[in-house]
From Swiss-Prot:
It is found in: Cytoplasm, Cytoskeleton. SUPFAM superfamilies: Actin-like ATPase domain. Pfam families: Actin. Keywords: ATP-binding, Cytoplasm, Cytoskeleton, Hydrolase, Nucleotide-binding. GO terms for molecular function: ATP binding; hydrolase activity. It catalyses: ATP + H2O = ADP + phosphate + H(+). It comes from Naegleria fowleri (Brain eating amoeba). Its EC number is 3.6.4.-. This is Actin-2. GO terms for cellular component: cytoplasm; cytoskeleton. InterPro entries: Actin, Actin/actin-like_CS, Actin_CS, ATPase_NBD. Belongs to the actin family. Actins are highly conserved proteins that are involved in various types of cell motility and are ubiquitously expressed in all eukaryotic cells.
Amino acid sequence: VQALEVDNGSGMCKAGFAGDDAPGAVFPSIIGRPKQKSIMVGMGNKDAYVGDEVQSKRGILIFKYPIQHGIVTNWDDMEKIWHHTFYNELRVAPEEHPVLLTEAPLNPKANREKMTQIMFETFSVPAMYVAIQAVLSLYASGRTTGIVLDSGDGVSHTVPIYEGYALPHAILRLDLAGRDLTDYLIEDSHGTCYSFNTTAERECQRDIKGKALLYCFDFEQEMKIAAESSSVEKLYELPDGNVITVGNERFRCPEVLFQPNFIGMEAAGVHETTFNSIGKCDIHIRKDLYGNVVLSGGTTMFEGIAERMTKELTNMAPASMKIKVVAPPERKYSVWIGGSILASLSTFQQMWITKEEYEDAGPGIVHRESF
């Protein structure tokens, strides 16, 4: 029986069958409820919409994101997202497949237990397992030791991993991620005479961010060139057919990751957070971490980000240290891909938590020593 894998992110849910090379379903982790009951006449009065359905009816719905900064904050809504994943997106009966779920680093124990309880009691899955997102990204890159900078829509983490185990004392969380960059781009582009304010327009911005933004290697230099010529400008066609010019926002927006003070945030940039995370690890493994810095998540998709990280870490690390930053081309989905690989390994099959074990031991069984 093929296992299912669901990677629940703050912004997008990625789901599919273990063993596949990419998730079969990718949709926004959003729940929408009607603003007023009466508007929905003739629409089969659903009390809640999920994912892409929400996007298409966005004018008449109130939006909620059940996952904030990587952590589930609303379990009723989360259950709806899982229900939608199994029955509408993957079209499977969850009681017939083992399910691999992913969780954010430092996810509270109670949350992990709640996920387990819902899977066994609501969806009657035969077996399940919960894996840490960054660890899966590392597996996807073919490594078991390294440090992962995972940056998604709602949160970024630096996670040092040694021989397959995340080192919890050295994990750092940065509440700066894709959504903040999108918001910054919205504010920044108000100067370009095209205003983005609703969630619909926010999606446009997310699109611009993906298509037009270039990561500059040398911020000051790029800004100087931008001031002197229009060679850095890119034209972008909006969904409504209008064309706008995206100028030096192309450098300013990604620069927020390295200089959070651009958006008034008092926090270390991603390079410094990575450096600090390595500094919390045993001195004997630091060399292995510096030599295996793996980028993961949609917010690391900017061009030139690996070169920039290498440059910044080289400036901060001891002079003799060899630094290698890897940005796999499929890193937007590397968490999911790592899970797909893991759940297909013959050695992993004994790691599943079965329904019987759950019934004997209760939700706490999920904390059993991981793989």
